Structures are given as C-alpha cells and as structure tokens.
UniProtKB/Swiss-Prot annotation:
Keyword flag Secreted: yes
Record's keyword annotation contains Secreted: yes
Covalent S-S links between cysteines: none
Pfam families according to UniProt: PE
GO cellular component, one term: extracellular region
Residue stretches making up the PE domain: 1-93
Main location: secreted
Cell location: Secreted, Cell wall; Cell surface
The organism's taxonomic lineage, starting at the top: Bacteria, Bacillati, Actinomycetota, Actinomycetes, Mycobacteriales
Gene: PE_PGRS8
Domain of life the protein comes from: Bacteria
Family: Belongs to the mycobacterial PE family. PGRS subfamily.
Xref: InterPro entries: PE-PGRS_N
Alphabetized UniProt keyword annotations: Cell wall, Secreted
UniProt name for this protein: PE-PGRS family protein PE_PGRS8
Length: 175
C-alpha cells in the first residue's frame, strides 16, 4: 500500500508565491520588450545595422519563448491550486469518515450510562414544540438550541456553551 502525504495549506501558499513570481517576470518582460525587440543600430554602417537586426531577432525569439513559458506557468499554478483544493477536500472527507465511527465508539458507554455523550454537540429542539435542546457532551460540546419557549441544552463542563433558548425562553446553563 502506498501513502501520500501533502499539506494543502503549503501547496496553496506555494501556488500563491509562484503566481506572484510569474506576474513579476511578466512585468519585467513587458518592460524589456520594446528595448530588446527593436534594437537601434549604433551607427549608419552595414555592420551596425546587421548586429542590431540580429539582436532584435533574438529579442523577438525571447519574447515568443517567454510567452510560451508564461502560458505553461499559468497552467502549472492553476493545477497546483486545484491540487491543493483536492487534497483539502479529500482530507476533510477522510476525517469525517473516521471521526464519526470513532466518536460513536467513545460516546456509546456514556450515552448508555448517563444519557449524554462525552464529546459532541447537543441536538436542537424541534421548532414550535417547546422541546428543550439536547445537552452537549460532558467534556466538549455546545448544547442544542431549544424549540419555541424551551430552554437550550447544557454545554460541556470543560468547553462548550449552553444552547440558545427558543423564542420566549432563556439559554441553557453550562454543565
């Protein structure tokens, strides 16, 4: 089995840096174009005219090559940016698929014994029913918002806020 390790934030930062470098090079090429493609002869003799024409031809060839390199550079930056987005999406999907079963396994004994998870947010009360919001996890998690006229659920003891009360009610307490 092979593993791929990528840091999407670092890839996105590299793409931004490369885009900045590309725009700087593009500005330098645009500034140099007039001076390198239309070189004036130093004198009126044939040798000066021929040398100026040769330098001008080299300048035009450089500008054509530079335009091709700029096109490649833009495509590379776009591919790098898209790759960073793809890696970030894959990491998020992978984390979501791992986290849910793991949290279910951690919370199962606490739900069975205490009726409250160890980690996680409480469910919101149904609107218009007056149902209270669910309590958040014992350690971590926010309480759920209460339904109309009902209090919000309790938040976690270490981290988390009590849920917002429904219309006409107060918010939940900590713990």
């Amino acid at each position: 089995m092979s593993f791929v390790i990528a840091a999407p934030e670092a890839i996105a930062a590299a793409a931004t840096d490369l885009a900045s470098i590309g725009s700087t090079i593009g500005a330098a090429n645009a500034a140099a174009a007039a001076n390198t493609t239309a070189v004036l002869a130093a004198g009126a003799d044939q040798v000066s005219v021929a040398i100026a024409a040769a330098f001008g031809a080299h300048g035009q060839a450089y500008q054509a090559l530079s335009a091709q390199a700029a096109t490649f550079h833009i495509q590379f930056v776009q591919a790098l940016t898209a790759g960073a987005g793809s890696y970030a999406a894959a990491e998020a999907a992978s984390a979501a698929s791992i986290t849910s079963p793991l949290l279910d396994a951690i919370n199962a004994p606490f739900l069975a014994a205490l009726g409250r998870p160890l980690i996680g947010n409480g469910a919101d009360g149904a609107p218009g029913t007056g149902a209270a919001g669910g309590a958040g996890g014992l350690l971590f998690g926010n309480g759920g918002a209460g339904g109309s006229g009902a209090p919000g659920g309790a938040g976690g003891l270490l981290f988390g806020n009590g849920g917002a009360g429904g219309p006409g009610a107060s918010g939940g307490a900590l713990g």
